[in-house]
């Protein structure tokens, strides 16, 4: 999603920020910086919601080149629902990359497996029963599950908790 690019860029910056500050022994600065990136994510998320709720139809026509009402309706339904969760997606990106900056490689990998399992579950169970509505629900709901997992992993990380030597 084009609207996720600011969050992806911030995530790359956070990864560098976290790793440099870990090397400098600045645990509190890491925590403060990551929390501030979450505020950025929520502001970007609100902006995304406003833009996509106001201009989803026009953007769908512009990107698809089609004026088919069924196609445009499906696109609009998806992007508007996903827009509501765009702040969550930003927090997911920041947290995943902050963990990588801390040197935690396994947890972000587990998060990717959660995403894969969730998508398979939706494809096998929910899409046959609910149709396109399940497709719309799939990614944003998986983002929420992954974000909770990553937040727990970040804030219970031994370095972040202060139980690992700096």
Protein language model annotation of sequence segments:
Residues 9, 50, 116-117, 144:
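Hydrophobic/small/kink-forming positions within alpha-helical transmembrane segments
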Residues 104-107, 122, 133:
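A short pocket-lining beta-strand/turn micro-motif at the edge of beta-sheets
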Residues 14, 83, 95, 121-122:
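Hydrophobic alpha-helical segments typical of transmembrane helices
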Residues 23, 115-118:
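Alpha-helical transmembrane segments of multi-pass membrane proteins
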Residues 1-56, 89-111:
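Small-residue-rich hydrophobic transmembrane alpha-helices
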Residues 118-127:
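Transmembrane alpha-helical segments of integral membrane proteins
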Residues 89-92, 118, 146-149:
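Membrane-embedded alpha-helical transmembrane segments of multi-pass integral membrane proteins
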Residues 18-84, 126-166:
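Short alpha-helical transmembrane segments in multi-pass integral membrane proteins
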